[in-house]
């Protein structure tokens, strides 16, 4: 982790990501043990619901023998973020934060002398994608050469998957209705990181999943829950078993969760043997343990 923080996957280079994968395998196999020494303290800030994220980091901190300091803090509301950072600097060894405002997390990191881990913001979900990438390494033996099709709107998860293309030789295709694409400014920023463009966008579901190693999807926007033009548009990219069959017999399916069966994916497709979503969620513990361990050892 080049900056000490993990705010996005752009903070990782290939050796660091490879190390995270190797450590995740060791933690999953029970081969790693928490380092002995001074007790570490990690503040956790979860703004809003965070069922799986809370469980993952709770398991990680417990595995490492780290004392968790849960805080109810809304950055920038009662005091400048710089003041909050100053207090945290003297009290804990790292901060895990999940909040919608990525700019607030970035500002916290700018004023922090300790590592900050982005547990999810509106701009990225790096820890989640690290865990899902680990699951693909388990299933496919590596990430180079893979084709990931993200079916859905421009979301934090879509962006984090795209950021992974700057580390490995994998391709990402976004499938979405017109008007819901990744912004050009984001794609241009990736192009600056890596000269070869590895992200494509299409509005055709069949074309987007053709030859995909994994189809990944996320929940639809709330505006699609009522009948109307937006729901009609998103129904054209609903994943069903026919979608999986057209993609290929070896194609895997992953979902961020929570899932709304009958919206972004049918119940039959989600429960299909090619769906590895629950397997990926079982990997949240070891991968998040590896993440926190790396950050603390660098911080």
Role assignments for model-derived ranges:
Residues 250-251, 256-299:
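Adenosine-phosphate binding glycine-rich loop
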Residues 104-121, 227-248, 273-274:
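A short, gly/pro- and small-residue-rich
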Residues 1-53, 124:
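Positively charged, low-complexity intrinsically disordered leader regions
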Residues 47-62, 141-217:
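Glycine-rich phosphate/diphosphate-binding loop of Rossmann-like nucleotide-binding domains
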Residues 191-268:
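Rossmann-like adenosine-cofactor binding region
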Residues 36-42, 144-146, 250:
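Phosphate-coordination loops involved in phosphoryl transfer and adenosine-cofactor binding
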Residues 35-137, 261:
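Phosphate/diphosphate ligand-binding glycine-rich loop within oxidoreductases
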């Amino acid at each position: 982790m080049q900056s000490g923080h993990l705010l996005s996957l752009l903070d990782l280079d290939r050796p660091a990501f490879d190390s995270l994968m190797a450590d995740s395998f060791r933690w999953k196999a029970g081969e790693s043990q928490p380092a002995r020494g001074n007790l570490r303290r990690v503040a956790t800030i979860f703004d809003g619901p965070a069922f799986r994220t809370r469980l993952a980091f709770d398991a990680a901190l417990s595995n490492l023998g780290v004392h968790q300091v849960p805080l109810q803090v809304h950055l920038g509301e009662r005091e400048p973020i710089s003041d909050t950072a100053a207090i945290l600097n003297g009290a804990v060894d790292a901060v895990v934060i999940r909040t919608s405002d990525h700019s607030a997390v970035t500002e916290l990191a700018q004023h922090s002398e300790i590592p900050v881990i982005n547990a999810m913001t509106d701009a990225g979900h790096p820890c989640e994608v690290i865990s899902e990438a680990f699951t693909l390494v388990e299933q496919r033996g590596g990430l180079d050469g893979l084709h990931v099709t993200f079916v859905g709107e421009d979301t934090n998860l879509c962006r984090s998957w795209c950021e992974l293309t700057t580390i490995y030789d994998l391709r990402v295709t976004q499938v979405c209705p017109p008007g819901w694409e990744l912004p050009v400014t984001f794609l241009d920023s990736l192009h600056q990181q890596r000269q070869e463009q590895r992200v494509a966008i299409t509005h055709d579901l069949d074309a987007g999943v053709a030859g995909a190693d994994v189809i990944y999807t996320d929940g639809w926007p709330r505006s699609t829950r009522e009948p109307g033009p937006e729901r009609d548009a998103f129904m054209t990219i609903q994943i069903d078993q026919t979608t999986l069959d057209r993609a290929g017999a070896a194609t895997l399916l992953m979902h961020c969760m929570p899932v709304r069966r009958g919206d972004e994916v049918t119940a039959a497709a989600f429960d299909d043997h090619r769906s590895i979503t629950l397997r990926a969620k079982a990997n949240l513990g070891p991968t998040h343990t590896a993440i926190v361990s790396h950050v603390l050892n660098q911080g």
